[in-house]
């Protein structure tokens, strides 16, 4: 299988027009002010809203989300924020980043797998201090 599928879009006449879609990975990160549940949830919610909004994604497009946190963040699971946003039918997983000496701390990262228009290029989103991680990306702001 090629990793592509067709999604139907109904016209007003009732016929179905197919558009090509493919499975795409969308990346993003946000900085967290403190190792507190509220700070982790707020940063995650902002990150998810930005990623979904900038890429025109809806809940039904999502296949899965993988969240990671730097080792200094352990007060809450980022998936809790995603569930509160209505992603209750999307498989979510949380993991800890590798503790690389000198790496940025206080960071939540996410990789979203979603079906999107075949012609659309993913917009990766890096917010707050994490914009320094991927200055090569136009969406890193």
Located regions from the model:
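Terminal domain-initiation and capping elements
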Residues: 1-141
């Amino acid at each position: 299988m090629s990793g592509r599928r067709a999604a139907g879009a109904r016209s007003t006449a009732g016929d179905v027009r197919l558009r090509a879609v493919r499975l795409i990975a969308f990346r993003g990160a946000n900085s967290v002010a403190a190792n507190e549940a509220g700070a982790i949830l707020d940063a995650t919610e902002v990150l998810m809203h930005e990623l979904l909004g900038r890429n025109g994604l809806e809940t039904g497009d999502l296949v899965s989300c993988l969240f990671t946190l730097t080792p200094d963040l352990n007060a809450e699971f980022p998936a809790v924020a995603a569930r509160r946003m209505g992603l209750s039918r999307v498989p979510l997983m949380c993991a800890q980043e590798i503790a690389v000496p000198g790496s940025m701390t206080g960071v939540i990262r996410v990789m979203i797998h979603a079906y999107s228009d075949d012609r659309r290029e993913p917009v990766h989103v890096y917010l707050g201090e994490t914009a320094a991680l991927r200055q090569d990306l136009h969406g890193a702001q």
